Design a protein with these regions (language model features):
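Short, solvent-exposed loop/linker segments at beta-strand-coil boundaries, enriched for Pro/Gly
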Residues: 40-60
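Residue-level signal for short segments within beta-strands and strand-turn junctions
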Residues: 28, 40-43, 99, 189
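Asparagine-centered strand-capping/turn motif at beta-strand->loop junctions
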Residues: 26-33
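Short flexible loop/turn segments that cap and initiate beta-strands
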Residues: 35-38
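Beta-strand/loop edge motif enriched in small/polar residues
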Residues: 2-12, 17-18, 23, 56-258
Length: 258
């Protein structure tokens, strides 16, 4: 069994309660009949997502058969209230397929609150502090074979959240993080709700961190960076430019703070 995607991303930012629907396909690549004993949402009835299979909506479907070479559409709907203070920045669930003792998963991600979302994109200019910023994948200030010599300036009081495996990447460009004593800039994970056994803020390695490659002159001031894989990594090679750190606190990184 295979699916047309391993992650379904609902990248609509809601300003009022709303819903949207996306779909993917499930394929039977084998010569025999594929028997899906169950297809369900990991969060079950607690999920904001709903699945539609063959015109029926629900959170659990059982005993589905696909003929050899056949496929089926699976529609997924999510309803989000961005004003719900208990929602995480990124609302995640999974569709779990059980077939002949094997498990296959498709991850579901939707924006849970009103924020600036940077999804695998080139970034420059100014990041304001009026809403949180969420990095999903790579937010790149310059990128090999695409762009360089750019500048990203981050205002005092800005909060930046990194999704799992996400990175702020600075390639032959400048990063200016302008925190102050009373309004520091904070980089941290996007998961703010606690895990079952641990507070969310105690778990390291929840996002990749800030990575500089041959940076132009950059500065980071009055900033906290926490719970990354590596807080700040600087690959200068033959570049004589500097990254100036002033009143920067880096803690709880998985491998190294700096």
């Amino acid at each position: 069994m295979s699916t047309s995607t391993d992650t379904l991303l609902f990248d609509t930012i809601f300003t009022t309660i709303g819903s949207t629907t996306k779909h993917f396909k499930c394929y039977n690549n084998y010569n025999g009949v594929l028997k899906i004993s169950s297809l369900h949402l990991a969060m079950e009835t607690n999920s904001p997502y709903r699945i539609n299979v063959d015109g029926k909506s629900g959170v659990l479907f059982e005993e589905i058969e696909l003929l050899p070479g056949d496929s089926m559409f699976i529609f997924v709907e999510v309803t989000i209230d961005p004003n719900g203070q208990n929602l995480p920045l990124v609302v995640e669930d999974k569709i779990i397929f059980n077939t002949n003792g094997n498990e296959h998963q498709v991850v579901l991600n939707a924006w849970g609150q009103d924020a600036y979302f940077h999804v695998n994109e080139l970034v420059e200019g100014q990041w304001l502090n009026d809403k949180p910023h969420v990095i999903y994948g790579v937010a790149a200030v310059g990128f090999p074979n695409l762009d360089s010599g750019k500048t990203l300036s981050i205002d005092a009081g800005t909060t930046i959240h990194g999704h799992a495996n996400s990175v702020l990447y600075v390639y032959k460009s400048s990063l200016e993080v302008n925190g102050t004593l009373n309004d520091p800039v904070v980089f941290q994970q996007d998961r703010m709700e606690d895990y079952l056994l641990y507070p969310a803020d105690s778990v390291s390695g929840q996002w990749r961190g800030i990575y500089f490659f041959q940076p132009n002159q950059s500065s980071i001031t009055h900033t906290e960076i926490k719970n990354a894989v590596v807080g700040i990594q600087i690959d200068t090679l033959h570049n004589n430019q500097f990254v100036v750190l002033n009143k920067v606190k880096i803690n709880n990184s998985l491998y190294a703070n700096l």
